[in-house]
Amino acid sequence: MKITLSKRIGLLAILLPCALALSTTVHAETNKLVIESGDSAQSRQHAAMEKEQWNDTRNLRQKVNKRTEKEWDKADAAFDNRDKCEQSANINAYWEPNTLRCLDRRTGRVITP
């Protein structure tokens, strides 16, 4: 079977538009947007894991907050006690900065101004 040049050109003329038509339909863009509810099994599992981690660290966060608040209260009380000690009418009262207490100069005992 001998195919002549004119038959090849004719066949090419028929197949080329078909190939172009198929290639454009294969690569056609779509303008549809798929919106998921976000309620997939993976997202639920991820949310459950995050909640579990948040709950596990809750005690630690509370301890840190309580410790910080306790230290602040202690420093605040010491500041007030220092002011009271320094303004005391007792001339033997002095403020001990290392122990944060008001002491008597003569005895070294704690006094309340």
UniProtKB/Swiss-Prot annotation:
Q: Which UniProt keywords apply?
A: Signal
Family that this chain belongs to: Belongs to the UPF0482 family.
Q: Does the entry feature the keyword Signal, yes or no?
A: yes
* Underlying gene: ynfB
- Give start-end of the signal peptide: 1-28
What is the source species?
Escherichia coli (strain K12)
UniProt xrefs under Pfam families? DUF1283
Cellular-component GO terms for this entry: cell outer membrane
Report the protein name in the record: UPF0482 protein YnfB
- Asked whether the keyword Ion transport is assigned, the reply is no
Family annotation (NCBIfam families): PRK13659.1
